[in-house]
Amino acid sequence: MNNKVHVLQGIVIRSKMQKSIVVSINRIVKHSMYKKFINRTTKIYVHDTNNISNVGDIVEITECRPISKTKCWKLTSIIKKYNSS
């Protein structure tokens, strides 16, 4: 049994759903043939029980049991709040 906990950091790009946010995860991948580094992004649906995060926040998320068809991550903490001013 694998007890390794997956923890990622990302930026909230959408928070208009109830108890759900969409987090963008950026990673750098090396191209296998051209050996050039490429930026890749992944959009992950995250469960936010208290609706505390807003667009632009940098958050930490943890993998959990499936909550719905698309959500299997939960919000652990907000690392940095986004200020719009």
Swiss-Prot record:
Keyword Ribonucleoprotein: yes
Gene3D superfamilies attached to this UniProt entry: Nucleic acid-binding proteins
GO biological process, one term: translation
Record keywords: Ribonucleoprotein, Ribosomal protein, RNA-binding, rRNA-binding
GO cellular component terms attached to this protein's record: cytosolic small ribosomal subunit
A UniProt-annotated Pfam family: Ribosomal_S17
UniProt cross-references to InterPro entries, sorted A to Z: NA-bd_OB-fold (IPR012340), Ribosomal_uS17 (IPR000266), Ribosomal_uS17_bact/chlr (IPR019984), Ribosomal_uS17_CS (IPR019979)
Keyword Plastid attached: no
Family affiliation: Belongs to the universal ribosomal protein uS17 family.
Role summary: One of the primary rRNA binding proteins, it binds specifically to the 5'-end of 16S ribosomal RNA.
PANTHER family: 40S RIBOSOMAL PROTEIN S11 FAMILY MEMBER (PTHR10744), SMALL RIBOSOMAL SUBUNIT PROTEIN US17M (PTHR10744:SF1)
The protein's assembly and partners: Part of the 30S ribosomal subunit.
NCBIfam families found in the cross-reference section: PRK05610.1 (NF004123), uS17_bact (TIGR03635)
UniProt-recorded name of the protein: Small ribosomal subunit protein uS17
Species the sequence originates in: Blochmanniella floridana
